[in-house]
Structures are given as structure tokens and as C-alpha cells.
């Protein structure tokens, strides 16, 4: 099949719509279930190369959770500890495969933004991954293959309409790519830059310490940024993203947005949050929303009389501003990546408030000296990669 007709494009008025191969060849994917839309497939074909490159760079299974052209989260298939399982809604004794761990981590990076996501897997989707996805609100999934059991589970989602796309793992896109904007065709070479440890050799700070886990997290961050709408900044820890700031016109706003998401990821691990007395039978999205409000400045919206009764068995004690600040201050060992240079040291100032110890950015600002000086002030290790990663 060399063409797939779609219901409409980005919006219902944009008809007709289709995806096709310009050379007349067969499409490199098969729709196993559902009827994926235009935006679904944009997410699918941005997310699959991301997870494939993560797997190639690290040797570990990888997954991503995509929404509207950018990753809400991406992760490697590292085991979950007991706290991970609790905050990601996994049963303590549940057996999980590496690819299931990868997706659970990717979705757990920013569960609120992953609501209605497109899932991407580097490896075969197995029953454990499908079973977890079954309990989440998701629009579809792309993977190189699916086990029979996983396929049967996923086909029960959304009344049998869940979108399942199988990608040819051997497919390599053409070296040139095109897109039309306002009737004008743009053409460029594909961004085939390889992200690996060789990009991290130019450490420009006084602190040269860069352990293997930090190198891994830098690679996770940079590959994620390669497929994130610019401007973008990504915080990573323990083989997963914990905050992605996408599509901001200001670099500092990227750093703040991603930093606030990283703070929220860490606040989900606070003892008060882990002990929240949710009512029996509460749905995962309702828990996510309640936690998001509880750890915010708008906590009264979920703790007020008439509100808390809908989600909690009893009214929990507030998580105060000082408690939140003290908890986030404990965070450390975080890596941050940027798709372009930091123009000012204020980005470093903001990043270190979220526990950032390692930074990877291209360098090249006329104020690089100021950025390096700020990193040195906090003992941060910073590598200049020399590689910009804009994505539009």
C-alpha cells in the first residue's frame, strides 16, 4: 500500500487528507487496528525515530509518550523501584519487562501531559506493556512488532478502535525531506546527526566529573530534544526525562517550564503525596489531576470543603510552600540539555534550583563566558556539544 486516506488533516475542515510515498513505493508501516488521524501519524513518525535512536545509542529498550508533535516523556527500560511503582500506579508485585518499564517511565515523566498520548516503543510490544496501556487514556501506539497477546489486549481499548501501527524496523527515510508552507516547498537534508558520547568530550567547566550515568542521561536528553519542537530544554535523571519544555520563543522560559515539570515529578515522590488517601475506585486521570493541584499553589481547589470529598477519603494536610521548596532542594544529580546555546547565565541559575548537576548544550553564545562562570559558581559540569538540535 503506497497511500492511506485520512478522515481529515489537522482540523475537520482540512479535507481531503492522506499520507503517501512520493516515489510510489509502499508505506513503511501497517495499520493493525483503528483509523489513525493526521496528527496521530505526525506523532507516530516523530516518536519512532526517537526511540529507535535511544535504543541504538544506549543498547536499552526505549519508549516515548508523544502529544501534539513533542514528547511529554521518553525513557530507557530500567527497572522501577518501589516508589516508582507507586507514583506510576503499578502494583508492587507486578512483573514488568524492560520495554514495559520504559513506557511506564516515559508516561510517568509528565502524566498530565501524557493524557491521550501516542506511545512509541523501540522493541516488540509485549503483554506487560499492553496491559499497562490498557488502563491509560491513550490514542495509539507504534512499535516494530506486537506479540499476539499484546495485540489482543490493545484491540479491546477504545471499544475496539485503538490505533495500532506496526513500523518496518528496517525502514530508512530518504536523505532529503520536504514540506509545504503557504504553497511554498521547503527542502532540506534530514537531521541525521548521531548523538553519542563523542558529543560530550568538550567539557568547558572547572568541574570535569562526568560519570557514566550522567553521560547516559545527557544522551537521553539530547535525543529527546532532537524530536521536540523548538525552542526546547529537557531535564533527565535515571535514564528518563523528568521535564520537557517545548515550543517556547524564549530560552529561559523553556528552562523554567521544563524545570517546573521536573520539580513536579520530584514532588510526586514526597511522603505526603505518597500517603494521599484516595477514595476507592478513583480513576488514574482523576488521581493525576488531584496530585497536580495538591502540589501546586492552587491546592485549595482540591482541599476545599466540597472538593476534597470527591477524591479523598479524608482531608489531607496541605503540602506547604516551604515543604515543597525544601523537598525540591533535596533533588540532585539531574542533567539538563538544551537544543541551542544558553544566551545568559540565568538558565543555569534556574536549572540548578531543580537539582541540575550536569548540562549539555551546543555553546556558541557571545556570552559563553558568563554561562560557564555561572556553572562554575555551582560546581556544575557542562559540556559544549557543538550540535544545534532545532526541530520544526
Model regions: which residues?
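Gly-rich Lys/Arg/Thr-decorated short loops/hinges at beta-loop-alpha junctions or inter-strand turns
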Residues: 23-35, 109-115, 189-208, 285-307, ...
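Flexible, glycine/charged-enriched surface loops at secondary-structure junctions
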Residues: 57-65, 165-167, 230-237, 267-278, ...
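Active-site-proximal loop/turn and secondary-structure-junction residues that shape catalytic pockets
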Residues: 70, 125, 237-240, 248, ...
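C-terminal binding/interaction regions
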Residues: 117, 121-122, 135-165, 170-172, ...
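Conserved helix-loop functional segments at active or binding sites
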Residues: 53, 227, 264-268, 353, ...
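Glycine-rich phosphate/pyrophosphate-binding loops
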Residues: 61-62, 67-72, 76-78, 232, ...
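Glycine- and Gly-Pro-enriched alpha-helical subdomains that act as flexible
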Residues: 72-111, 242-342
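Active-site loops and adjacent core secondary-structure elements that bind or stabilize anionic groups
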Residues: 1-199, 214-232
